[in-house]
UniProtKB/Swiss-Prot annotation:
Residues 254-374 are annotated as: Coil 2B. SMART domains: Filament. Residues 250-253 are annotated as: Linker 2. Residues 1-69 are annotated as: Head. It comes from Mus musculus (Mouse). It holds the Pfam family Filament. GO terms for cellular component: astrocyte end-foot; astrocyte projection; cell body; cell projection; cytoplasm; cytoplasmic side of lysosomal membrane; cytoskeleton; glial cell projection. One of its GO terms (biological process) is regulation of neurotransmitter uptake. Phosphorylated by PKN1. Belongs to the intermediate filament family. GO terms for molecular function: identical protein binding; integrin binding; kinase binding; structural constituent of cytoskeleton. The modification Phosphothreonine is found at residues 7, 40, 107, 147, 380. This is Glial fibrillary acidic protein. The modification Phosphoserine is found at residues 12, 35, 79, 266, 320, 382.
C-alpha cells in the first residue's frame, strides 16, 4: 500500500492545483462529483533555465505536500472501500431477507389468517345455528308448557266442579240419611203405636167379653137367655175386620215408606259411590297431571339452564373469537409496520449505497484523471467545472424506487466563479 501511495504521488503533479482549487470548504470527504474541462495550456517558445532551481524547489515542496495528501486520500479511500463492501454485504443480506419476507411470510401469514378466519366464521355459524335451534326448541317447549298449563287449568276446573258435585252429593246423602233415620224413627213409633193400639184393642176386647159375660149371666138370672152368641160373634167379626184392615193399612203404608226410603237410600248410595269413584278418578288424574307438570317444569328449567349455558358459552366464544381476530389484526398490523420499517431501512441503505457509489465514482474519476494526466507538464488551470449531484429518493410501490436528481455545475476561472447552473430531474424511477 505504501508503494502504491508513492507511485501515485510520483505520477501526478497537477493534483495540488485541483485540491487547492477546491478550497477548504470543498473537502473530498463530502463526495461531490468533479468534471475537469479539457485545457490546452500555451507552450513556451523557449525554456528559461534560470528558473530551474526555483522550479525544482517548488517541485519538491509540491511533491511532498502531494505525497501527504495522496496518502491521506488513499487511507480514506481504503476505509471507504471496506465500508462499501461491508454495506454491500449488509445490503445483500437485507435484500435477501426482504425478498424472503415478501415471497413467503405474507402469503403464509395470509393463508394462516384466512384459515383461522374461515374456521372462526364456521364455528360462529354453527353457534348461531345452534342458538337458533335452541330458541326454536325453547319456543316449542314454551308452547307445550302453555298447552299443558291450559289442560291443567281445565282439569283443575273439572276437579273443582267434581268436588262441588261431590259436596252436593254428600249433602244429599246426608239429607237422605237423615230422612232414612227419621223414617226409621217414624216406623218405630208407628210399630210402638200399633203395639199400643193392639194392646188397647185386646184390652177392650177382653173388657167387652167380660161385660158380655156379666150381661149374659145377669140376663140368664133375670130373664130368659137371649141369643147373644150371634151378636157377639158379629161384633167380634167386625172388630177383627177393623183391626185386620188397620193392621194391613199400617203395614202397607210402612212397607211403601220403607221401600221408598230404601230406594232413595240405594239411589243416594249409588250416587255417592259414583261421586267417590269420580273423585278418585279426578284425584288420580290430578296426581298424574301434577307429576307431568313437575316433570315438564324440570324439563323446562333444564332447557332454560342449557340455553343460558349455551348463550354464555356462545358469548364467551364470541368474545374469544373477537379477541383472536383483534390479536390477529394487531399482529398483521405489526408485521406490516415491521415490513415498512425493513423497507425504510432498505431504502436508507440504498440511499447510503448510492451516495457511496457516487463517492467511489468520484474517487475513481479523480484517480483516473490523475493517471491520465501523468504525462502533462505542470500548468495552471484556468477553467474548472464542479458538478454536484444530490439525490432525493422516494419509495414507490412494487419494489421500485423513485428519485429526484439535482445536478449543480459550477465553472471557475482563475479562482473566480464565472458560471453556476443547477438542473433538477424529478421522479426518476430506478
Amino acid at each position: 500500500m505504501e508503494r502504491r501511495r508513492i507511485t501515485s504521488a510520483r505520477r501526478s503533479y497537477a493534483s495540488e492545483t485541483v485540491v487547492r482549487g477546491l478550497g477548504p470548504s470543498r473537502q473530498l470527504g463530502t463526495m461531490p462529483r468533479f468534471s475537469l474541462s479539457r485545457m490546452t495550456p500555451p507552450l513556451p517558445a523557449r525554456v528559461d533555465f534560470s528558473l530551474a532551481g526555483a522550479l525544482n524547489a517548488g517541485f519538491k515542496e509540491t511533491r511532498a505536500s502531494e505525497r501527504a495528501e495522496m496518502m491521506e486520500l488513499n487511507d480514506r479511500f481504503a476505509s471507504y472501500i471496506e465500508k462499501v463492501r461491508f454495506l454491500e454485504q449488509q445490503n445483500k443480506a437485507l435484500a435477501a431477507e426482504l425478498n424472503q419476507l415478501r415471497a413467503k411470510e405474507p402469503t403464509k401469514l395470509a393463508d394462516v389468517y384466512q384459515a383461522e378466519l374461515r374456521e372462526l366464521r364456521l364455528r360462529l355459524d354453527q353457534l348461531t345455528a345452534n342458538s337458533a335451534r335452541l330458541e326454536v326448541e325453547r319456543d316449542n317447549f314454551a308452547q307445550d308448557l302453555g298447552t299443558l298449563r291450559q289442560k291443567l287449568q281445565d282439569e283443575t276446573n273439572l276437579r273443582l266442579e267434581a268436588e262441588n258435585n261431590l259436596a252436593a252429593y254428600r249433602q244429599e246423602a246426608d239429607e237422605a240419611t237423615l230422612a232414612r233415620v227419621d223414617l226409621e224413627r217414624k216406623v218405630e213409633s208407628l210399630e210402638e203405636e200399633i203395639q199400643f193400639l193392639r194392646k188397647i184393642y185386646e184390652e177392650e176386647v177382653r173388657e167387652l167379653r167380660e161385660q158380655l159375660a156379666q150381661q149374659q149371666v145377669h140376663v140368664e138370672m133375670d130373664v130368659a137367655k137371649p141369643d147373644l152368641t150371634a151378636a157377639l160373634r158379629e161384633i167380634r167379626t167386625q172388630y177383627e175386620a177393623v183391626a185386620t184392615s188397620n193392621m194391613q193399612e199400617t203395614e202397607e203404608w210402612y212397607r211403601s215408606k220403607f221401600a221408598d226410603l230404601t230406594d232413595a237410600a240405594s239411589r243416594n248410595a249409588e250416587l255417592l259411590r259414583q261421586a267417590k269413584h269420580e273423585a278418585n278418578d279426578y284425584r288420580r288424574q290430578l296426581q298424574a297431571l301434577t307429576c307431568d307438570l313437575e316433570s315438564l317444569r324440570g324439563t323446562n328449567e333444564s332447557l332454560e339452564r342449557q340455553m343460558r349455558e349455551q348463550e354464555e358459552r356462545h358469548a364467551r366464544e364470541s368474545a374469544s373469537y373477537q379477541e383472536a381476530l383483534a390479536r390477529l389484526e394487531e399482529e398483521g398490523q405489526s408485521l406490516k409496520e415491521e415490513m415498512a420499517r425493513h423497507l425504510q431501512e432498505y431504502q436508507d441503505l440504498l440511499n447510503v449505497k448510492l451516495a457511496l457509489d457516487i463517492e467511489i465514482a468520484t474517487y475513481r474519476k479523480l484517480l483516473e484523471g490523475e493517471e491520465n494526466r501523468i504525462t502533462i507538464p505542470v500548468q495552471t488551470f484556468s477553467n474548472l467545472q464542479i458538478r454536484e449531484t444530490s439525490l432525493d429518493t422516494k419509495s414507490v410501490s412494487e419494489g421500485h424506487l423513485k428519485r429526484n436528481i439535482v445536478v449543480k455545475t459550477v465553472e471557475m476561472r482563475d479562482g473566480e466563479v464565472i458560471k453556476d447552473s443547477k438542473q433538477e430531474h424529478k421522479d426518476v424511477v430506478m
